[in-house]
Curated annotation (Swiss-Prot):
Gene3D superfamilies linked to this entry: 3.30.1370.30, 3.30.1490.10
Protein name (Swiss-Prot/TrEMBL): Small ribosomal subunit protein uS8c
Organism: Huperzia lucidula (Shining clubmoss)
Subunit structure: Part of the 30S ribosomal subunit.
Similarity comment: Belongs to the universal ribosomal protein uS8 family.
Biological function: One of the primary rRNA binding proteins, it binds directly to 16S rRNA central domain where it helps coordinate assembly of the platform of the 30S subunit.
Residue ranges the record marks as coiled coil: none
Localisation per UniProt entry: Plastid, Chloroplast
Cellular-component GO terms for this entry: chloroplast; ribonucleoprotein complex; ribosome
GO biological process, one term: translation
GO molecular function ontology, one term from the record: structural constituent of ribosome
Assigned keywords, A-Z: Chloroplast, Plastid, Ribonucleoprotein, Ribosomal protein, RNA-binding, rRNA-binding
PANTHER family: 40S RIBOSOMAL PROTEIN S15A
């Protein structure tokens, strides 16, 4: 049985948000890098960096907060397609989160992208996670 690196990343980010941590360190896999780039592009994280410790590669996400109470920009980060139950959608049926306010991250044949990009390019794929 393998590790679900996407679920590990999502759980690490969610826990860091709850603890109001400034940064979170996750394993740097190709899929985690692409999800991190989407989170940066959509404004959910401040910065994205990489760290190498020996043979291990890590990605450092700098989380974004707003106001004096430090409310996190990421209120919910949810894994959808899991190793035991993969969910694939046609581009017409990719769900909208919060009426388009949230982001759905599908993995397509052209790489990982946002739901808006997938609809624009008319490409369906496996729905990895929801972010809002």
């Amino acid at each position: 049985m393998g590790n679900d690196t996407i679920a590990n990343m999502i759980t690490s980010v969610r826990n860091a948000n709850l603890g109001k941590e400034e940064t979170v360190r996750v394993p740097a896999t190709n899929i985690n890098r692409s999800i991190g780039k989407i989170l940066l592009q959509e404004g959910f994280v401040k910065n994205l960096g990489e760290l190498r410790e020996g043979t291990n590669h890590f990605m450092i996400l700098t989380l974004k907060y707003r106001g004096r109470k430090r409310e996190p920009y990421i209120t919910t980060l949810r894994r959808i397609s899991k190793p035991g139950l993969r969910l694939y959608y046609n581009y017409k049926k990719i769900p909208k989160v919060l009426g388009g306010m949230g982001v759905v991250i599908p993995s397509t044949s052209c790489g990982t992208m946002t739901d808006r990009e997938a609809r624009q390019k008319q490409i369906g794929g496996e729905i990895l996670c929801y972010v809002w």
